[in-house]
Curated annotation (Swiss-Prot):
Task of the protein: One of several proteins that assist in the late maturation steps of the functional core of the 30S ribosomal subunit. Associates with free 30S ribosomal subunits (but not with 30S subunits that are part of 70S ribosomes or polysomes). Required for efficient processing of 16S rRNA. May interact with the 5'-terminal helix region of 16S rRNA.
UniProt-listed PANTHER family: RIBOSOME-BINDING FACTOR A, CHLOROPLASTIC-RELATED (PTHR33515:SF1)
GO molecular function: ribosomal small subunit binding
One Pfam family, short name: RBFA
Region of interest (Disordered), residue spans: 120-142
GO terms of biological process kind: maturation of SSU-rRNA
Protein name per UniProt: Ribosome-binding factor A
Ranges of biased composition (kind: Basic and acidic residues): 120-130
GO cellular component: cytosol
Length: 142
């Protein structure tokens, strides 16, 4: 979310979650004919819907890792099929246009975790001063 942007409304969150569930169900059934999607385990981690509910960004990650580019291309090619299936599962006036994007939050979390567990950071954490060693407001440090 960019600076100054309004947080999503309850309706956006609810519709996003309904879409995430519906897309995950369609992917789980594996009815795709696209060779890049056949036999691939794909997780839909989040769906962000625009305020007017006309566009939805679908965040996906392949289970077991691997190259996500062919999966994104396959999902883009299967967009019409997905929208048709979603229209049968979710009651909306119009199914949003779907945009697919790799979810990098797991990679970011893993990178942060490895940084926190690095020997240098561990040393700093283990040798951090205790709370009672910090001067308080009434203590001028003398």
């Amino acid at each position: 979310m960019s600076r100054g942007a309004k947080p999503p409304s309850q309706r956006q969150l609810r519709v996003g979650e309904e879409l995430r569930h519906a897309i995950a169900m369609v992917i789980e059934r594996g009815e795709f004919r696209d060779p890049d999607l056949l036999g691939r385990a794909i997780t839909v981690t989040e769906v962000r819907v625009s305020p007017d509910l006309r566009n939805a960004t679908v965040f996906v990650v392949p289970l077991g890792g691997g190259d996500v580019a062919p999966i994104l291309a396959g999902l883009k090619r299967a967009k019409a099929f997905l929208r048709h299936e979603i229209s049968r599962m979710v009651e909306l006036r119009a199914v949003p246009d779907l945009w697919f994007q790799e979810d990098t939050t797991f990679d970011t979390a893993s990178r942060i975790d490895s940084i926190l567990n690095s020997p240098e950071v561990r040393r700093d954490i283990d040798h951090a001063p205790a709370e009672d060693e910090f001067p308080t407001d009434g203590d001028d440090g003398q």
